[in-house]
Amino acid sequence: MKKNELKPAVVFEQFAKINEIPRPSKREEKMIEYLKNWGESRGLGTKVDETGNVIIRKPATKGYEHLKTVILQSHMDMVCDKLVDVEFDFDRDPIKTYIDGEWLTAEGTTLGADDGIGCAI
């Protein structure tokens, strides 16, 4: 399997973009800005509250307005851990991913899928 074959493609394409953004705990400013711009560029109601939560509202699809609201939530930061012999700056460097058998993994660092994939959805 190749990275461009991962499904759903739109989620993994977004996850790849997110992995370009440094987002250590307590230093999520770049991720906040990315999500804010993403929502605003699509004309969605977007705001950042006083603690840095990004709230993006999308109206219901036509014909589904009568259904209950769905809320998706995920955190923006990631666990910053690396192998001892790997040089990596979590404040600057992008996460480099690759396929290992059936798994998407990272080169010498944590993957950031907790919860980068949640943000990608």
Which residue ranges define each predicted feature?
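A non-catalytic alpha/beta surface segment that caps or lines the substrate-entry region
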Residues: 24-68
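Structural signal for hydrophobic packing residues in well-ordered secondary-structure cores
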Residues: 16-19, 39, 43, 80
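Short glycine-centered, acidic/aromatic-flanked micro-motifs in structured strand/loop junctions
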Residues: 21-23, 58, 74, 108
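Active-site metal-coordination/substrate-binding segment of hydrolases
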Residues: 64-121
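N-terminal capping segment at the start of a domain
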Residues: 2-26
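Residue-level recognition of alpha-helix initiation/capping sites
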Residues: 9, 29-30, 113, 120
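Predominant activation on well-ordered alpha-helical scaffold segments within soluble catalytic domains
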Residues: 12, 16, 36, 119-120
